[in-house]
Amino acid sequence: YGSIIVEATEDLTLPAAQLIGTVIEGTHLIINNERVCRETLLRACCGQFDKIYPSAVPAQHQALMPADTLPLTSNLSPLTYNGSAVEHPLVYIPVFPGTNCDYDSAKAWRKAGAEVETTIFRNLTGEDVLSSIDEMVEHINRCHILMFAGGFSAGDEPDGSGKFIASVINNQKVGAAITALIDRGGLILGICNGFQALVKSGLLPYGKLGMVTPDSPTLFRNDINRHISQMVTTTVATTASPWLRGMQVGDTHSIAVSHGEGKFVVNEALAKELFENGQVAFRYADPMTGEATMEAPHNPNGSYYAIEGIISKNGQILGKMGHTERWEEGVFTNIAGNKLQPLFDNAVRYFRKK
């Protein structure tokens, strides 16, 4: 059934343990007294098909900041909740065809102290779609937080993922319920596929529906033209949101990403506006320096200006590609960096008014 490789600081005396080698300094291996460079092994393993399936490509867009961008105030104060304090805010997660991060998301919310409700969006028949829309509206009208979880909605339908969810969001009934949620101080979160839907519906970066134009930002295929699944480092770029409460500009986190279309594409004029408004929430960063970067694999998809996540102008809506919900104690233990990104705790604290 396979074996487990364990690195230990002392000899293991377990009956089935077998010593296979010792760790040495440098980037080479010594096997049967023959010294082999790590780069040679990587080329032998990956070089044959690297031209067809590259593991990394030079960034197609190199600028780290739009020209003439005014500096952002280091730490902006997020808005506060004007309603009555809620000890256990209600989170609603609609589960669409292809959503696959709802369990992890619900678990993370419950751990943070929220109550969670989920519903299945059924699309087998027209009647199923209509009843699912009515069910969504009912839950959105009762919830404090609306989350669109990650996945591959409708199998990442042709010519861009997230369109199925975006079409539901733009339904007149659903859209009215979402607008009412925003007006009463509610929060909205979209991760990965959910981020794609927020962007393609106009909720990000505009904060309301019906604003999408040909010049609007979008999320496009990764530069390597295939799915990526890895850990990345992101750096905090603003604090102007309840989601980012307690963070400081420059803080870094180690976050899992898994997507085929995560490249944030935006024109220079709108990017300048996003930076100056404090709407760029997170950026891909070099783990050694903590500085934003366009270089792969640290910026795994080639996102313009190294943007990983953005917020609406009022800070109530956050969208990001990294799967913050996938970390818990005992996971990613061999990955360096701060893996606790307290988005869920911050949202709960916002409603508790603490």
Indicate residue ranges for each PLM-predicted region.
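Short cationic amphipathic helices and targeting signals
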Residues: Y1-D11
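Generic beta-strand/beta-sheet core signal
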Residues: E7-T9, I20-V23, N32, P94-F96, ...
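Intein/HINT protein-splicing elements and their conserved insertion hotspots or analogous self-processing inserts
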Residues: T9-L90, G98, K107
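Beta-strand->loop->alpha-helix junctions that form or flank phosphate-binding loops
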Residues: L12-R35, E117-N123, S216-L219, N225, ...
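Extended, subdomain-level signal for the structured scaffold at the beginning of enzyme domains
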Residues: S74, L79-S161, N171, L244-R245, ...
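Amide-donor transfer/coupling interface in amidating biosynthetic enzymes
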Residues: S131, E135-E138, A177-A180, M211-K354
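Cysteine-nucleophile active-site neighborhood
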Residues: A149, S153-A240
